């Protein structure tokens, strides 16, 4: 729904509640047609394993009517399992991240894996400390170790809405924090935030 709302340029809240304007239906139809023909494959298998994922990707790549998979996005890492008995969740996540790295090399395809953060980042006290750090990655330090890049998305306005005494902030701005970059520098990149369509964008485009 979020992809369709963003592609159609329709307010995400109106999309969810069905409060659409007459012209929105035309935009929605065009976006639906465009996405229907897009080489995007979604799989909502719960508790999927690396082995199952590789098998599904190979089936797509072997289909002559489809383009090969060029990017894998996992939403999110903690929903995956190894399919084997492990002593604890930390070891299981470590095994998953290690095998994802191996799979990326074997299949020559980049992988973007979303991850939960620990609740500690929500409990920070001052205005700046809500910004996530590598130590906030949930369940395992192997995420930091195995990843080539670690990016955090952050919005001041998210925390300002929870703390009315925190002062005014720009609701249309966000940050992409490059916390790890194996092949380059770490930095913080300013972004625009389009809340109506639930998407981040280049600052210049937002203006």
Regions found by a protein language model. Give the residues of each.
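Cytosolic-facing regulatory segments adjacent to core modules
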Residues: 1-68, 82, 188-190
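Sparse, context-dependent recognition of short Cys/His-centered cofactor- or disulfide-binding micro-motifs
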Residues: 20, 25-27, 33, 38, ...
């Amino acid at each position: 729904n979020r992809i369709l709302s963003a592609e159609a340029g329709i307010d995400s809240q109106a999309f969810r509640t069905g409060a659409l304007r007459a012209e929105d239906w035309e935009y929605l139809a065009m976006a639906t047609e465009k996405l229907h023909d897009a080489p995007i494959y979604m799989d909502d298998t719960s508790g999927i394993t690396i082995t199952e994922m590789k098998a599904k990707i190979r089936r797509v790549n072997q289909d002559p009517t489809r383009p090969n998979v060029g990017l894998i996005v996992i939403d999110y890492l903690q929903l995956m399992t190894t399919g084997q008995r492990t002593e604890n969740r930390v070891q299981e996540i470590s095994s998953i991240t290690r095998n994802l790295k191996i799979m990326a090399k074997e299949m020559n395809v980049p992988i973007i894996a979303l991850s939960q953060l620990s609740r500690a980042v929500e409990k920070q006290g001052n205005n700046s400390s809500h910004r996530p750090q590598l130590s906030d990655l949930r369940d395992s330090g192997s995420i930091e170790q195995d990843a080539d890049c670690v990016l955090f998305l952050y919005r001041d306005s998210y925390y300002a809405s929870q703390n009315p005494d925190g002062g005014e902030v720009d609701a249309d701005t966000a940050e992409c924090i490059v916390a790890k970059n194996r092949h380059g520098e770490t930095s913080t990149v300013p972004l625009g935030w389009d809340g109506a369509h639930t998407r981040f964008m280049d600052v210049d485009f937002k203006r």
